[in-house]
Amino acid sequence: MVGSDIGIDLGTASILVYIKGKGVVLKEPSVVAFDRDTNKIKAIGEEARLMLGRTPGNIVAVRPLRQGVISDYTVTEKMIKHFIQKALGKKSFRKPLVSVCVPSGVTEVEKKAVEDATFAAGARDVKIIEEPIAAAIGSGIDISKPCGNMIVDIGGGTSDIAVISLGGSVVSTSIKIAGDDFDEAIVRYMRKKHNLLIGERTAEDIKIKIGTCYPLAQPETIEVRGRNLVTGLPRTITVSSEETEEALREATLQIVEAVHSVLEKTPPELAADVADRGIVLTGGGSLLRGLEELIEEKTGINTMTAEQPMTCVAIGTGKYVEFLAGKRDEEF
């Protein structure tokens, strides 16, 4: 059986495309810019991201996926089509078999919307896979074994936490707190603490450069430019990593609580496996400094980040059909 032609990690923040034999061939922001007057799409991906917060009145840059689900069907369909064509190149005549991952908490209606949009974008066949399963496969875990593995996948819009055994999720939860919420928490903090208005991109920059959710041995600082809410004029201030820890405390503790609640519901044998094997973090949000230490401190379980956290889900999505094929062969 030929494996999946394409695996798509349809993320709120980024879209990654995996092609069998080639690996991850595309990673772009899930942003679309279109002209409000003509309804024509002006840019997709990185080009559109650069327009966020900087567009004239008639051009709007939007994220068609919110918290892991489709918020704008037509735009999502066009975006998927664009990325499939870009990944395969113009020479591809055969419609691809596409597997797409969705957060574990989505409804059947939301799954169907993803499936329909992918078919409409030109897929020959579509397989839907839950994010924690894809993340586990992509991080190199053999999910077919009768052994408990815990995955915490922190994306842009959702965090998926699951204990996986024998190819499926035994206990899972999906919370709408993730990387985007880290950015929003920083925006709110800057407004409240410093009377400074900053945009999403600046907040993301602060998070990447000095963001932490656990005390650093050596605190760091960064210069931040924004608009003073009192005078209305541009202003530059110095922000420390300790302030980001304060800003991110509420969001990160909600993720820790979700991990805790999944562990509480896990059957004892599988919980013992997790205690033995540790917790694996995947997704772009897992790159936030201090997250490993915070989860480890609060659960008492060894916590580690996967080797390629950003691409785990895309790789696992692409390899999922091969996993299913292997399972089918075993049954016959």
Label each region the model flagged:
Residues 1-154, 162-280, 286-332:
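Nucleotide/phosphate-binding catalytic cleft detector across ATP-hydrolyzing
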